Amino acid sequence: MDALSSNRRQFLKFLGTAAVIGTVAPDTLAVDQAKATSLTILHTNDVHSRLDPFPMDGGRNAGKGGIARRATLIKQIRQEQKNVLLFDAGDVFQGTPYFNLYKGEPEVLAMNRLGYDAGTIGNHDFDGGIDNMVTQFGKASWPLLIANYDFKNTVMDGRTKPYRIFEKEGIRVGVFGLGIQPEGLIPKDAYKETKYLDPIEVGNDTAAKLRSEQHCDYVICLSHLGFKYDDATVSDNVLAAKTRNIDLIIGGHTHTFLDAPVAVNNPDGQPVWINQVGFAGINLGRIDLTFEQGKAISSTGKSVEVK
């Protein structure tokens, strides 16, 4: 808890510009404020087909979550904020009878209604088989981003993108996806000839392309690698420490509850912020950024309970 509190304080003071701007002359302040652009990032992970709130059974999650409440919360934030992006970090499928009966269709259609901007692939999204992924994700109104799965020899070929660029008031946000190693985790007959590519190498290459070639001001990775492990398995923490040009990792897979994003320095000593908000749609991640002249000058983040 102390570590989380420390990271929260770090995050709230990210680049500290907002704290010193009050010392600037009034005329300069007015000019700076005119240039400032705000952007709110909302995100979910590991919703696992939880369309309804948890039942009122006395459990620790009783009454929490539910797609209707999430929709209301997202709508409220969009009414309050001009520039909003909404992402998911994978494992949309599996976990309730909705998936058993309908194989993911209600989940995808619900995300369409909520206006998701993009998502990535989790291991449980293969649970109905790769043919089912084609059927269900083919109904999505949002792009499925995955840079380190090569689907060339499968029916998913051409149905995903490695990255997508979003522009909000001149701010270019590059977003890409990374998935977990399927071997040993997903049945072979579910992912078939999908090839897994090294997430560190792909992450470095994709982030560099977004930053240098696509001139993105902010780079986000939607990751289903998992937050952190006790061994050398590639996780979000490892990804942050071994890559450059990534500003924010929105994670999934390990169902990690973070009160606020945590920072891991990259090889250049720059902080990479990592966030994950548990599972089942209990929480909605929220990160508020302020940009001036194409650079993020301040940032706050939190986990918002859906209730």
Enumerate the predicted regions with their spans.
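Acidic, metal/ion-coordinating pockets
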Residues: 2-306
